[in-house]
Amino acid sequence: MGALALPPGVIERIVELLAPEEVWLFGSRARETHGPDSDWDLMAVLPDAAPDRDLDLATVWGNLRELRRMRVEVIPIRRRDFDESRTTLGELAEAVAREGHVVYGR
C-alpha cells in the first residue's frame, strides 16, 4: 500500500459520519517519509454549519474507533477555521495545506 493509499473504507466511513467538504492526508504519509508503523493523519474539513459534536475529538474518535484500530487519526475542523488558519505559520491547518494532499472533495 503506497503512502497516499488509505486503508479500504476509510473515506466512506468519514463521509458517512461527518459529511466533510474535503479530507486531507498530512504528516509522514503525505510527505512520503513514513515508516511501516506510521499512522494516517487526516483532517476533515466540515461545513461551517457542522454541529459542535462533529468537532469534538473524543466524540469523533469514539465514533470512528474502527479506524483508530487501523491507525487512522481524523482531526475535524470547520471550513471557515481551516480557511482562516491555513495561512498562519504554526497552525496545524497551515501545515496541512502546505504539505498535505486532498484525498476526498465534493
Give a label for each model feature.
Residues D41-V45:
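Short beta-strand->loop micro-motif that forms the acidic, two-metal-ion catalytic signature
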Residues M1-E22, A30-P36, P47-R106:
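Catalytic core of pol beta-like nucleotidyltransferases
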